[in-house]
From Swiss-Prot:
Entry protein name: UvrABC system protein C
Protein encoded by which gene: uvrC
Biological processes annotated in GO: DNA damage response; nucleotide-excision repair; SOS response
Pfam families registered for this protein in UniProt: GIY-YIG (PF01541), HHH_5 (PF14520), UVR (PF02151), UvrC_RNaseH (PF22920), UvrC_RNaseH_dom (PF08459)
Family annotation (NCBIfam families): PRK00558.1-5, uvrC
């Protein structure tokens, strides 16, 4: 028990109402957040002589201060608890690491609706279908829908400013509502309705309506129209035959759990309108000594209740673990959704088979993860031995990317004991240097990264500098000049020079900018982890550079044309739907853009052609 914290005096001030408590250590950091139906009873349990677990003993030993927030109801306490966990990320709470909102397919409420992928808050007017497990699943579905139901997927800024149909119309992937006369309002609305029914799982209704239209077209001797509808019917059938369909209208999440070697995997299977949309595995951060029940309860609460998740709640949640707070969770979710949400732990029939599938997927994913973690642990231990360090808990690597000195981007990737920590990857746009000066770029990114206060847990044990002696010299110079409150001598700076012909396995490592470097055997686990983090850094830098280059690509060609300033450039791109549309436009079409004279249109036309 904490020698500093006066638990007896504190407990005299605590109410027996429901609420949330936050525990702080001596440094003022929140180390645990909890909720209680009876705050006094719950908090008293921490200060008994016989505590339930070593984890609780370790927690109590660090308590310096406790804050209490009283709430009106248990539901309010549950919601507040998970918001605090998300805000403070306490080390003794089970933490959901992946906090990204799931993507949906969005059908807009425009006169001519469009299909698009959407993440986040649902402010735009329209309909949302999902959630899908990842962006790839949404893009794949959108591509499929475009082939079967050719409604537009272009941005409104492009749609409103087109004077002729785009390539999607030419290849039959869009009906071209942007240009009057290409498609009737009735036909476009009919295709939109098919999409709505299809995404709602009502494939039979889509097929029934299409078959009726095909038969009518045949009776009217409109054989081309009948053939087009026949192709559409066949496309819908091909898709629906591949899908596993459960009981019609099922709308549920199925959660399976696996737990081994102190690591948990929670696998979520998404079923909407009776179809399996996909699944995703989660590996929540689990403090040592945590029971599986706490892992599951905390995960489920964070997964559905944290405010920014923006999840669409299903009608039913299936679990393979009996929660002590199942009724409270169901009531809280129902209150949020404005309808009844059922939490089921002992399903039968199809639902039991779903649960078995989720459990099997969780176990498989956990085995794979443990194998990968074992590999990364071995590699980091080998590298620590090579570098004569007791352990490597955190490692950061930097790389620079540019094209002929333009659009320079620096990347920083982070590895911890479990491997890549992608949530902490960063890119830095480099400015104010001589184009192509990689040394100046490295100098700038290191000052921006380390020339400020850093939490103790975020100080890296090793900093890898991709580029060899010269870049290592820059890093050493930067660290020599740093005036920061943290221990700048703690990170080991290590230069990595690529081998002959940039072949993997021939890298040279440098502790100092002067003198000879050293190499590791090609089969060395220590070398493998260096190659891994260096490649991650390189890919991250290249990705950022390509995005930056693509951003300026649309405008760079126009910047060289006399008489075309920023406003006219923006108007041209907006009116023509992008640079490609402008390249394909005639002089007469360019001259129709507001603010563009016939003479300037000719100049733009010939400049883009030559």
């Amino acid at each position: 028990m904490s020698e500093i914290f006066d638990a007896k005096a504190f407990l005299k001030t605590v109410t027996s109402q429901p609420g949330v408590y936050r525990m702080y250590d001596a440094g003022g950091t929140v180390i645990y957040v909890g909720k209680a139906k009876d705050l006094k009873k719950r908090l008293s349990s921490y200060f008994r002589s016989n505590l339930a677990s070593r984890k609780t003993e370790a927690l109590v030993a660090q308590i310096q201060h406790i804050d209490v927030t009283v709430t009106h109801t248990e539901t309010e306490a549950l919601l507040l608890e998970h918001n605090y966990i998300k805000l403070y990320q306490p080390r003794y709470n089970v933490l959901l690491r992946d906090d990204k909102s799931y993507p949906f397919i969005f059908l807009s409420g425009d006169t001519h609706p469009r299909l698009a992928m959407h993440r986040g808050a649902k402010h735009a007017k329209g309909e949302y279908f999902g959630p899908f497990p990842n962006g790839y699943a949404v893009r794949e579905t959108l591509a499929l829908l475009q082939k079967i139901f050719p409604i537009r997927q272009c941005e409104n800024s492009v749609y409103r400013n087109r004077s002729r149909p785009c390539l999607q119309y030419q290849i039959g992937r869009c009906l071209g509502p942007c240009v009057a006369g290409l498609v009737s309002e009735e036909e476009y609305a009919q295709q939109v309705e098919y999409v709505r029914l299809f995404l709602s799982g009502k494939d039979d209704q889509v097929l029934t309506q299409l078959i009726a239209r095909m038969e009518k077209a045949s009776q009217d001797l409109a054989f081309e129209e009948a053939a087009r509808i026949r192709d559409q019917i066949q496309a819908v059938r091909r898709v629906t035959e591949k899908q596993f369909v459960s009981n019609a209208g099922d709308d549920l999440d199925v959660i399976g759990v696996a737990f081994d070697a102190g690591m948990a995997c929670v696998h979520v299977l998404f079923i909407r309108q009776g179809k399996v949309l996909g699944s995703r595995s989660y590996f929540p951060k689990v403090p040592g000594g945590t029971e599986l029940g706490e892992v599951v309860e905390t995960f489920v609460g964070q997964f559905y209740l944290q405010g920014s998740q923006m999840r669409t709640l299903p009608g039913e949640i299936l679990l393979d673990f009996n929660l002590s707070d199942k009724t409270l969770l169901a009531d809280s979710l129902s209150e949020l959704a404005g309808r009844r949400i059922h939490v089921q732990t002992k399903p039968r029939g199809d639902r039991a088979r779903y649960l078995k599938l989720a459990r099997t997927n969780a176990a498989t994913a956990l085995i794979t993860k443990l194998s990968q973690q074992s590999t990364i642990t071995q590699r980091l231990s080998a590298l620590a031995a090579v570098l004569k360090l007791p352990a490597i808990k955190r490692m950061e690597c930097f790389d620079i990317s540019h094209t002929m000195g333009e659009q320079t981007v620096a990347s920083c990737v982070v590895f911890d004991a479990n491997g890549p920590l992608r949530a902490e990857y960063r890119r830095y746009n480099i400015a104010g240097i001589t184009p192509g000066d990689d040394y100046a770029a490295m100098n700038q990114v290191l000052r921006r990264r380390y020339g400020k206060a850093i939490e103790e847990s975020k100080i890296p044990d090793v900093i890898l500098i991709d580029g060899g002696k010269g870049q290592l010299a820059q890093a050493k110079a930067v660290f020599a000049e740093l005036d920061v409150p943290w221990d700048k001598h703690r990170p080991l700076l290590l230069g990595v020079a690529k081998g002959a012909d940039r072949k993997a396995g021939l890298e040279t490592l440098f502790f100092e900018p002067e003198g000879e470097g050293f190499s590791l055997p090609p089969d060395s686990p220590a070398l493998h982890v260096i190659q891994h983090i260096r490649d991650e850094s390189h890919d991250h830098a290249i990705g950022g550079h390509r995005k930056k280059r693509a951003k300026v690509k649309n405008t760079s060609t126009l910047e060289t044309i006399e008489g075309v300033g920023p406003k006219r450039r923006q108007m041209l791109l907006k009116y023509m739907g992008g640079l490609q549309g402008l390249r394909n436009a005639s002089v007469e079409e360019i001259a129709k853009v507001p603010g563009i004279s016939q003479g300037l249109a000719e100049k733009i036309f010939w400049s883009l052609k030559h």
